[in-house]
């Protein structure tokens, strides 16, 4: 059985920590250390200055369960990679495992390979069977390349006679606490822009990206916009890893890589010499130079005569203009076409059907082999405001292939969304049909004609902001005669031409909705370049405020997969000029003037209480849902029901309709110390906390997330008038009843007027006669 773990380790490995000196001791008294039966000599060179050792467990990489190896040749694979600017000098696998007491020691063992080369074999003696064991396995660092595959394989036998390859006694478990430790030494890279985004971002590195930004003096809003463009680009590259961008106006980072924004008047003295290549700034310029404080670090310099030049240089970077050499002068840049709503590269298009082949990075991800294959996973990032009312679901045109069983059995293709089951399609060589006429019609076709076409409808309730469509091929082994091999190789595949179609859905959603904001950056990311979004800074923003702005823009870039080329950054005094845009506010109650000016519009006032709690709100909160005039969520507590006492280190995240323009949104971050925002970003990167961001108000207290719903709702998007009327009256039956009564009265009044007129005409005609 083959289990392909869709994970990537790298030289740093996510959530890295120092490798314990005695891993076996950590397991407690019940874990025994095992000496491998075969371990090649590890050629571990001493790390050079600047080297580091890091380790990560399978649990830290997302596998919080035991990996089970089953069958006579059960295996599991974990790919890992090494950064371009690091070289591995030593590697160790601390394997924690157990195995079946039924395994024959002289015929069975566990094999560990790196890139197909065996590095260790572990015995399965009877004395240690069924126990949790630990083994430290040195790995020859010469075997470790850029991209690597760690495989664990069980060679298992329970009898010397004919055996069932799937017998229940053939198993071995690999504990999620198993860890891989890599000692790395920095590798010098040339100062060459052609390597970008390396070393500032390396796709091989699965850790969260932390890239400092340095401004030689306090940046104006135009310079910060240029920096935001670059931050959003790096955020789009980081994707699921997440990214934070510490900002500094004090000094260059003491170590590592960083991005620097400067003009001739602010260029650091280290680069003002002629041999630097950047001393004479005559226009938009991008350069890569060594960090003068760290011989292993690099600086990405974005330079220009003024803020306009800086924006042009930042745009060239974000649009991946071809650059080479240590220094590049940016010429004319053709402006990219304006983005259309919902056309973000990372989002499933709602304009036309989307091929599955466009939703995976490699075609091989749609293929599996073996009797116990891994899942086929297709990522689906849907627009948050899809209007799914009265829709059966999302249509999928599925084409799939598989090894046809010789006769009908229990083989099937199971379809699910995240953890929610959708349907089972028997692998009979024909499309599946539930109705008798369709089954009869399908039986007329040729059995085994591939690909099999199946129209599916995916239930919308199972989808989340970042969903995963999963396909599991289950192949039922045929039963053969004793000692006769009747187990041919089997495989299954989802055709890349299979499609998912959102083109029939409108975009309409009740707001505020902080779940859509936290997960997808909505409504700001409705346009991928953020051309209708404005960030409002607090008064006298400090370094932490600058970092928060850059990290937010990086978060938006990760959602859309596109840089925020047209996001605007302003002070509170200029907000009136941006009335027709969605606004994002930052600051404290004192540093952000708009919190005081718009106090009447905030869902939570300065004393932590609701500010718009009226008799109608009290009444509607107590009406049954089907009688309510309001369409807000009723599954969350309201701000009027919560006694909230914000503390200085709390973070308030609020959503409300813009006081400047109907239908426009405001999302506000309020905290006394801008450094508290780092805890909110950490919560976004934690799936267990991210799901708690809901409603119109989120309160982050230490590591606890509390979501509240405000007393007012507004809507964004558009519906055709007939659809809107049907939807509105279905949610507001009281208004429907009143409308019906009003129409009846109007009809009665019209009928009365007509009848009286008709009567008068008859009387006049009769009198004339």
Q: Each predicted region: which residue ranges?
A:
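Bacterial N-terminal signal peptides
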Residues: 2-12
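Solvent-exposed alpha-helical segments and adjacent loops
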Residues: 17-769
């Amino acid at each position: 059985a083959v289990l392909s773990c869709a994970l990537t380790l790298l030289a740093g490995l996510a959530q890295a920590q120092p490798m314990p000196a005695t891993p076996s001791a950590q397991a407690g008294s019940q874990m025994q250390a095992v000496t491998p039966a075969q371990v090649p000599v590890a050629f571990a060179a001493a790390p050079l200055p600047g080297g580091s050792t890091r380790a990560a467990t399978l649990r830290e990489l997302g596998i919080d369960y035991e990996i089970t190896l089953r069958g006579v040749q059960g295996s599991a694979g974990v790919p890992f990679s090494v950064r371009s600017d690091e070289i591995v000098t030593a590697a160790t696998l601390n394997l924690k495992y157990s195995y079946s007491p039924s395994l024959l020691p002289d015929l069975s063992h566990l094999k560990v390979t790196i890139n197909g080369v065996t590095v260790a074999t572990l015995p399965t003696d009877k004395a240690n069977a069924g126990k949790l064991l630990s083994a430290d396995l040195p790995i020859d660092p010469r075997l470790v390349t850029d991209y690597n595959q760690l495989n664990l394989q069980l060679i298992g036998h329970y009898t010397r006679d004919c055996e069932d390859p799937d017998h229940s006694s053939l198993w071995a478990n690999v504990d999620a606490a198993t860890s891989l430790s890599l000692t790395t030494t920095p590798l010098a890279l040339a100062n060459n822009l052609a390597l970008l985004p390396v070393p500032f971002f390396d796709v091989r590195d699965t850790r969260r990206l932390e890239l400092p930004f340095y401004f030689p003096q306090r940046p104006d809003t135009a310079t910060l916009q240029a920096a935001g463009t670059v931050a959003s680009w790096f955020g789009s590259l980081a994707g699921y890893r997440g990214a934070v961008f510490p900002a500094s106006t004090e000094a260059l980072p003491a170590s590592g890589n960083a991005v620097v924004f400067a003009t001739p008047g602010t260029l650091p003295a280290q680069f003002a010499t002629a041999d630097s290549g950047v001393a004479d700034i005559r226009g938009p310029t991008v350069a890569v130079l060594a960090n003068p404080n760290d011989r292993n670090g690099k600086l990405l310099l974005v330079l220009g005569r003024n803020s306009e030049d800086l924006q042009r240089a930042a745009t060239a970077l974000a649009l991946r203009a071809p650059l080479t050499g240590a220094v590049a002068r940016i010429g004319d840049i053709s402006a990219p076409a304006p983005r259309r709503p919902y056309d973000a590269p990372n989002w499933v298009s709602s304009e036309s059907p989307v091929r599955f082949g466009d939703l995976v990075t490699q075609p091989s991800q749609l293929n599996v082999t073996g009797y116990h294959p891994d899942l086929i996973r297709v990522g689906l990032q849907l627009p948050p405001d899809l209007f799914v009312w009265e829709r059966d679901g999302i249509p999928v045109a599925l084409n799939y292939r598989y090894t046809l069983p010789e006769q009908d059995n229990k083989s099937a293709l199971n379809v699910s969304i995240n953890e929610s089951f959708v349907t089972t399609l028997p692998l009979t060589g024909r499309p599946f049909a539930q109705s008798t006429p369709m089954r009869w019609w399908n039986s007329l076709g040729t059995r085994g004609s591939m690909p099999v076409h199946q129209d599916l409808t995916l239930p919308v309730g199972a989808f989340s902001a970042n969903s995963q469509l999963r396909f599991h091929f289950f192949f039922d082994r045929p039963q053969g005669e004793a000692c006769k091999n009747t187990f041919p190789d089997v495989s299954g595949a989802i055709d890349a031409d299979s499609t998912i179609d959102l083109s029939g859905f409108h975009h309409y959603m009740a707001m505020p909705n902080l779940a859509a904001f936290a997960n997808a950056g909505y409504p700001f990311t409705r346009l991928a370049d953020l051309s209708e979004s404005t960030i409002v800074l607090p008064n006298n923003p400090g370094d932490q405020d600058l970092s928060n702005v850059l990290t937010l823009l990086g978060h938006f870039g990760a959602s859309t997969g596109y840089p925020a080329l047209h996001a605007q950054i302003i002070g509170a005094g200029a907000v009136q000029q941006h009335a027709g845009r969605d606004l994002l506010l930052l600051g404290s109650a004192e540093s952000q003037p708009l919190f005081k000016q718009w106090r009447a519009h905030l869902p939570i006032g300065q004393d932590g209480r609701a500010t718009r709690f009226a008799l109608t709100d009290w009444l509607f909160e107590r009406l049954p849902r089907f009688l309510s005039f309001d369409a807000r969520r009723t599954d969350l507590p309201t701000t009027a029901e919560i006694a909230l006492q914000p503390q200085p280190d709390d973070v308030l995240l609020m959503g409300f309709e813009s006081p400047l323009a109907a239908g426009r949104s405001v999302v506000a971050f309020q905290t006394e110390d801008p450094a508290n925002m780092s805890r909110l970003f950490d919560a976004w990167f934690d799936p267990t906390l991210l799901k708690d961001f809901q409603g119109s108000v989120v309160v982050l207290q230490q590591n606890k997330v509390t979501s509240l719903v405000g007393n007012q709702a507004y809507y964004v998007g558009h519906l055709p008038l007939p659809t809107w009327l049907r939807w509105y009256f279905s949610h507001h039956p009281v208004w429907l009843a009143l409308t019906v009564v009003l129409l009846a009265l109007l009809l009665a009044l019209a009928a009365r007027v007509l009848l009286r007129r008709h009567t008068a005409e008859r009387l006049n005609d009769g009198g004339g006669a």
